[in-house]
């Protein structure tokens, strides 16, 4: 509850700062897609020291970035995932907002970009041991309309708002030509009760009224785009 309140407070403070200082960042000063203003070493390690006023999260989380340019050079299926790179790991509410407020949101990312937020030491790949037996829930949104849903998904995960939060590996937003998709990856696909609980709670967090489906990673690897939903809510 303390962390959840801190997340809400930080969000309110951020909005207030925006309203009192509406001058936009100069174009030349904007970070590149996926770029974080800060030390590159922090991409692979959670912060060691937590200031007394900081609010520690239950888990450390890492943002990962997969750019269209990097993916275009990968033509073989076995190369899938090799272009994904970590950009920052955070362990507190304050670190999260510091990062989130200094990176481009989904609506500002190039078409073809995949942007991930996964628990520390879990890679956003089917081959990762923690993800291997899992699956994913996916919501589809109109082009340029995923920013709020992406933020609420992040806050729901890092704020431990899911009853089966231990099942969650992370989330990814996929920016495409005509639409954007957000997916939550989970660990144990055959745990139907846990997956259905996550799907229902996620829809509630997003106030999303369309039906969403859950696909096993194993089926996605075998059948790719023709993989069928195993669960729906």
Curated annotation (Swiss-Prot):
Tissue: Mostly expressed in leaves, flower buds, leaf buds and anthers, to a lower extent in roots, stems and green immature fruit, and, at low levels, in petals.
Acidic residues bias (residue ranges): 27-41
Keyword Protein biosynthesis: yes
Post-translational modification: According to the redox status, the Cys-131-Cys-169 disulfide bridge may have a role in regulating protein function by affecting its ability to bind capped mRNA.
Localization per Swiss-Prot or TrEMBL: Nucleus; Cytoplasm
Biased composition range(s): Basic and acidic residues: 14-26
One GO process term, biological-process aspect: defense response to virus
PROSITE patterns: IF4E (PS00813)
Positions annotated to bind mRNA: 76-81, 108, 126-127, 176-181, 221-225
Keyword annotations: Cytoplasm, Disulfide bond, Initiation factor, Nucleus, Protein biosynthesis, RNA-binding, Translation regulation
Annotated spans, EIF4G-binding: 55-58, 65-104, 152-161
GO terms, molecular function: RNA 7-methylguanosine cap binding; translation initiation factor activity
Primary location group: nucleus
Protein purpose: Component of the protein complex eIF4F, which is involved in the recognition of the mRNA cap, ATP-dependent unwinding of 5'-terminal secondary structure and recruitment of mRNA to the ribosome. Recognizes and binds the 7-methylguanosine-containing mRNA cap during an early step in the initiation of protein synthesis and facilitates ribosome binding by inducing the unwinding of the mRNAs secondary structures. (Microbial infection) Not involved in the plum pox virus (PPV) strain D infection process.
Protein name as annotated: Eukaryotic translation initiation factor 4E-1
Gene name of the encoded protein: eIF4E
């Amino acid at each position: 509850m303390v962390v959840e309140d801190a997340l809400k407070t930080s969000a309110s403070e951020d909005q207030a700062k925006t309203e009192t200082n509406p001058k936009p960042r100069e174009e030349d000063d904007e970070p590149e897609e996926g770029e974080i203003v800060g030390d590159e070493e922090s991409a692979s390690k959670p912060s060691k020291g937590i200031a007394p006023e900081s609010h520690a999260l239950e888990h450390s989380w890492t943002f990962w970035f997969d750019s269209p340019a990097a993916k275009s050079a990968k033509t073989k299926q076995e190369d899938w995932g090799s272009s994904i790179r970590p950009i920052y790991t955070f362990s507190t509410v304050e670190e999260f907002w510091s990062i989130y407020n200094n990176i481009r949101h989904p609506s500002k990312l190039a078409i073809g970009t995949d942007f991930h937020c996964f628990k520390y030491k879990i890679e956003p790949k089917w081959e990762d041991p923690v993800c291997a037996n899992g699956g994913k829930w996916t919501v589809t949104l109109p082009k340029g309309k995923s920013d709020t849903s992406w933020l609420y998904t992040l806050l729901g995960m890092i704020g431990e708002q899911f009853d089966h939060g231990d099942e969650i590996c992370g989330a990814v937003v996929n920016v495409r030509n005509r639409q954007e998709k957000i997916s939550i990856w989970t660990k144990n696909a055959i745990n139907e009760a846990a997956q259905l609980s996550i799907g229902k709670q996620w829809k509630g967090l997003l106030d999303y009224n369309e039906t969403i489906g859950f696909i096993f990673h194993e089926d996605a690897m075998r059948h790719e785009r023709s993989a069928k939903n195993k669960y729906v809510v």
